[in-house]
């Protein structure tokens, strides 16, 4: 999508704010159903991040898979849970929580430092074979396959890992 600079920046700030607020909602809400809806907001914001980079198929697939399937599965699992079992022996802060938050905070700051200090210009994420470039691809399916295995390889793999983690979490929540 060819947007002017200020509109593109405003869109990224809006989506980033929605992503951060949704992530905080997932962690901070005490009611599991509110956390599940916040996770849906996170999934929507992540999928909308692909639209400004002209990755419409990845955005649509992520909306269909995550919001349409995974988040609905999580909401159903949360609805079948007994809510009273989560409030028994509810301690606001334990030693394990403190250690976990310390580790997560240190990882967050190290990632922020790494991202800010890395020169991202000139990095080639994928390599293309000369045979693929020389071939005349006529089918949209062929073009989509080439793009998924070259240009969008990293987002495609990250999407599959996030989907796997979400399914494992939904199954674990449903079994409890």
From Swiss-Prot:
The enzyme class is translocase
What Gene3D superfamilies has UniProt attached to this entry?
NADH-ubiquinone/plastoquinone oxidoreductase chain 6, subunit NuoJ
One GO MF term attached to the UniProt entry: NADH dehydrogenase (ubiquinone) activity
Q: According to Swiss-Prot or TrEMBL, what is its membrane topology? A: Multi-pass membrane protein
The alphabetized UniProt keywords are: Chloroplast, Membrane, NAD, NADP, Plastid, Plastoquinone, Quinone, Thylakoid, Translocase, Transmembrane, Transmembrane helix, Transport
Q: Which residues cross the membrane?
A: 10-30, 32-52, 61-81, 90-112, 152-172
Would you say which domain of life the source belongs to? Eukaryota
Q: Which family does it belong to?
A: Belongs to the complex I subunit 6 family.
- Assembly and binders: NDH is composed of at least 16 different subunits, 5 of which are encoded in the nucleus.
| Protein name (database record) | NAD(P)H-quinone oxidoreductase subunit 6, chloroplastic
Please report the organism this UniProt entry assigns to the protein: Ceratophyllum demersum (Rigid hornwort)
Taxonomic classification, please?
Eukaryota, Viridiplantae, Streptophyta, Embryophyta, Tracheophyta
Originating gene: ndhG
């Amino acid at each position: 999508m060819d947007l002017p600079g200020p509109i593109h920046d405003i869109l990224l700030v809006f989506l980033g704010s929605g992503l951060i607020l949704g992530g905080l909602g997932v962690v901070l809400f005490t009611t599991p159903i509110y956390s599940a809806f916040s996770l849906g907001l996170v999934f929507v914001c992540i999928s909308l991040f692909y639209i400004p980079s002209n990755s419409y198929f990845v955005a649509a697939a992520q909306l269909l898979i995550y919001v349409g399937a995974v988040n609905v599965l999580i909401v159903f699992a949360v609805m079948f849970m007994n809510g009273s079992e989560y409030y028994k022996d509810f301690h606001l802060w334990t030693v394990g929580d403190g250690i976990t938050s310390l580790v997560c905070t240190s990882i967050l700051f190290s990632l922020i430092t790494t991202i800010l200090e890395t020169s991202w210009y000139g990095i080639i994420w994928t390599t293309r074979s000369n045979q693929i470039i020389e071939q005349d691809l006529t089918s949209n399916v062929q073009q989509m396959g080439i793009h998924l295995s070259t240009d969008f390889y990293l987002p495609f793999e990250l999407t599959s890992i996030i989907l796997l983690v979400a399914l494992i979490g939904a199954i674990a929540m449903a079994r409890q």
